[in-house]
Regions:
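Boundary regions of SH3-family modules and the immediately adjacent low-complexity/disordered segments
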Residues: 35-39, 85-105
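Acidic (Asp/Glu)-rich catalytic clusters
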Residues: 129-139, 160-175, 198-209, 296-303
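Functionally critical loop-and-helix segments that line ligand-binding/catalytic clefts
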Residues: 105-123, 273-339
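Structural recognition of the beta-strand scaffold that forms the well-ordered cores
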Residues: 110-114, 141-146, 176-181, 210-218, ...
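Active-site groove signature of glycoside hydrolases
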Residues: 202-232
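Boundary/entry segment of secreted carbohydrate-active catalytic domains
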Residues: 100-150
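N-terminal Sec-pathway targeting helices
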Residues: 2-20
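Beta-loop motif signature
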Residues: 33-81, 85
Length: 339
């Protein structure tokens, strides 16, 4: 009969369970790491003045697509940090030094193009098919098309001669689009006239993909326009237009340059599409608020109203974009409801 040493058996069982628990913990950690990696965002940029970057002797930002991963978050001394993995290096980076830019369907920002007859007459797009190819090749998610406007010197109403070509391209590709009207009203009577023109235009151009808010385009011509001295009153004048459109169930968006928006239009109960050009031949990887040199960056009231940002008037040499045309970023969370 075999004698069993109960003491040794107990020790063996305890050791076995300790090893088992350790293996379970290790497998859990590995699983968590794998899961973290799978969920990591490759569209990450880290400022080059962080300790993590300096430790790797980097002189530039880590660019999108360089296999940068956010593993998890850590709070240290009441400050939030991201645990970042870059190749074989892992380090902590302050939350405010990490920026996300994802070009996937879950992107924080989406590309938008705006066009007019000038884009046809200048030879940028000679056919509808050429414009369709541009939209597809560059992953343009939204489009604004000029419906017409009022002349900035004589004040005559005009319509865009080529809007149908751009409209039909968006309809064919099922890309949500909207129209814009260049406002130059100098009084309430002209504002009412413009509102009536817009309503009639929309009545005659009801299409399935015309889903975006109608844009009132406030251009600044620097001393050349009949409205240049009226900027302190322009908000009041265009309110006559937007109120009439709203009463007809038309949602509106205001386009203006960032400085004029902040100086003269900030108190309007409106969302804004602002023009502020970066001067860089690339698609921005940060939102407008990160550009500290522009006037509205630190104005929380202004920034809370901006949902679209025209960052270039000459195109951006990225993503095969070689056309010299207006390009904008929009906040996806604000625009995806129009799909």
């Amino acid at each position: 009969m075999i004698k069993i040493n109960k003491k040794k058996l107990l020790v063996t069982i305890i050791i076995f369970f300790i090893i088992l628990i350790g293996l379970i913990y290790l497998l859990g950690a590995i699983s968590q790491a794998i899961t973290s990696t799978k969920k990591a965002t490759p569209g990450v940029i880290i400022e080059n003045n962080t300790e993590f970057i300096r430790s790797m002797y980097k002189t530039k930002h880590l660019q999108e697509g360089e296999n940068v991963y956010i593993l998890n978050t850590i709070t240290k001394n009441n400050k939030k940090y991201f645990k970042v993995k870059y190749k074989l290096s892992v380090g902590l980076v302050p939350e405010d030094k990490v920026y996300f830019f994802d070009r996937s369907e879950n992107a924080q920002y989406s590309l938008m193009s705006d066009v007019s007859s000038f884009d046809y007459t200048s030879g940028r797009f000679k056919t509808q098919g050429e414009y369709e190819l541009f939209l597809l090749r560059n992953n343009i998610k939204y489009v604004y098309i000029r419906a017409g406007g009022r002349g900035y010197t004589e004040g005559k109403i005009y319509y865009d001669n080529n809007f149908k070509m751009f409209r039909d391209a968006c309809e064919y590709l099922k890309i949500p689009y909207g129209f814009y009207f260049v406002d130059e009203a100098i009084n309430q009577a002209e504002a009412e006239e413009e509102a009536n023109v817009i309503l009639e235009f929309l009545k005659q151009n009801k299409t399935s993909m015309n889903k975006l808010p109608f844009v009132i385009d406030l251009e600044y011509q620097s001393g050349k326009s009949r409205t240049d001295t009226l900027w302190p009153k322009r908000g009041e004048i265009i309110t006559n237009i937007t109120n009439k459109l709203h009463s007809s169930g038309i949602e509106t968006l205001i386009y203006a340059n960032a400085k004029k928006m902040n100086t003269n239009l900030i108190n309007l109960n409106q969302k804004f599409w602002v023009a502020y050009y970066t001067g860089e031949d690339k698609i921005p990887t940060e939102w407008l608020s990160k550009y500290k040199e522009q006037e509205i960056a630190n104005n929380l009231q202004a920034m809370s109203k901006v949902i679209a940002w025209q960052f270039s008037e000459t195109g951006a040499k990225a993503n095969n974009i070689t056309k010299r045309l207006d390009l904008s970023l929009v906040l996806t969370k604000e625009f995806e409801k129009y799909k």
